[in-house]
Amino acid sequence: MQKSLLAIAMASLLTPISYLHAQEVQTNDTVVVTANRFEQVESSVLASISVVTKAEIEQLNVTTALDILKTLPGVEVNSQGGKGQISSIFLRGTSSKHTLVLVDGVKINSATAGGASLGLIPAFAIEQIEVVRGPRAAIYGSDAIGGVIHIKTIPANRQTKHDANLGYGNDDHSSLAWRSSGQLNDSTQASFVFSDEKSDGYRVNEVAPSGDSHGYQSQTLFGSLRHEIDDAWSVQFNGYQLSSDVEYANQFSGVKNESNTDFYSIAGSLNFHKDNYSSQLMVSRSDNESWDGVASGMVAKTALFSSRNSVSWLNHWVVVPALTLAAGVDYDQENARQGGANATNYSKTEKDNKAAYVTAHFSKNIVTAEASIRSDDDSAFGKHNTWNLGLGIAPSDYVEFIASTGTGFKAPTFNDLYWPSSGNPNLKPETSKSSEVGIRSYLPFVQIDISAYRNEIEDMIDWAPTGPGGAWTPSNIDNAKIEGIEIEALFETGVIEHRVSAEWKDPRDKSDDSFLIRRARENFSWVSTYSADRFGFSAVANYVGDRKDSTGKTMDAYTLLDISANYKMTEALTLGARVGNLFDKEYQTAHSSGGKYYVGEGRNWFATVNYRF
């Protein structure tokens, strides 16, 4: 990448800011847990991290987790159509399966495909989102080559409150939701969220007949119960359930198909905290059942069933005020099988992984440092070790210099290893080496984070023939190098708050120097919000650069503008409205093997009524 790139990027952000009145930006030291699997304030985290709070989500009036994520630096969301359709999250240009996704501490990545589905998680249910960019495999193991996304639905405070929410929009888009949380007694607190949503949708692929639409319906449940046994011991239970029916177009024929999914996860933990030591033993289980096929008629659908059983024991010691140690062990057992119209099953239906890790965090005076090491033992490919090092130097209260380096890996999925007649049980894990340098500046009128990163991924799994004229099978054939620069700036102009993020990246396939598919080289986001006693307004502009697809076609760059407003009629009743794609921009999100484009949604609107008591 050109050396002038960073200078140009900094100039583009700093030039308008120099004319602002010097007013202090409030930097809230939010408590986070995702970066190192223990609680710490956000400013002490050396990894690049973004945190979105409940208040910020409500200001934007968005409906899904993906709407929130696409405004953050380093996050690119690609959907094959509208809400509920297949979506990919490219964290710093890595594949969707390279991002670990947690919901209330429980992994929801698919055991069969590797990625995670976030398109139907309602924003109404979310209390906080933490996004850690850069590899965290030395702490979490497989799936965290690109980073970690942690969605939290359990409120941190104990205030009793209830929310009833109704929404309606174009394409007969409707939602009904309820949220309750608070104290059941002096030692027990609980939370509950229910959401029911449906829409007729729109024509998501040009191959579909004119007049077709592809809708969805979903029901979502979240729940938690925490009981404090005494001052040191507590137990917690939490769960997540999703049932959905999503229509989509067959990429070759255009015939309307339907995907029916039932997913649930449940977790229980025993927690101990006394003085400088804390420990958590968590047991969880998740199950996923999906059926795919023609939406109408008598044709049988194919089915996939998968489950994951997990046990984690985490320990955290504050040795001295400057030094924190953490260590833990993880065990995961995954199962998968096929059914319905699938005539044959996976060649193997079970695999497991055992792991142990240790991490240390040191902070004193101007120096912050961290180190982590982890060893995984996978039944499919054996042992694999990963590590991570980070260093921060803060010569003043206004600036901190950060550098980090580490390794990661992605284990082959069930589909890669054991798919009937084409799985490859000899696959190795994909591996990565990454490095990052950054500057965090806390000036009186602006907060700026600048990061430059490089991630090299080897033994990437892709389809290839076993030999001349041979059968095609997943193989360790690809290598990739992704370099990029991220900038995020927080500042105020009068009563309006701004969050501007920009990313320039160079995601390349090292075998032929081509660009990785569906990744833009430039992404920009500008979020502006205004809040008064009763009225709030927000505007979100997103620019996505041009992208190439596997078919060789290029999707043009596009810019979308979304606006929203809230009006608090009483202390309890709030009205909200949002218009997405305000200027009705036509754009493509992918090019299918059938020769047609997946298209994004045109101008759309959604209005809500929320009653809180």
Swiss-Prot record:
Similarity comment: family membership: Belongs to the TonB-dependent receptor family. BtuB (TC 1.B.14.3.1) subfamily.
Keyword Transferase: no
Protein name as catalogued: Vitamin B12 transporter BtuB
Organism: Vibrio vulnificus (strain YJ016)
Entry GO MF terms: ABC-type vitamin B12 transporter activity; porin activity
Domain TBDR beta-barrel per the UniProt entry, residue ranges: 159-613
Main location group: membrane
Motif extent (TonB C-terminal box): 591-613
Signal peptide: 1-22
Membrane topology reported for the UniProt record: Multi-pass membrane protein
Location(s), subcellular: Cell outer membrane
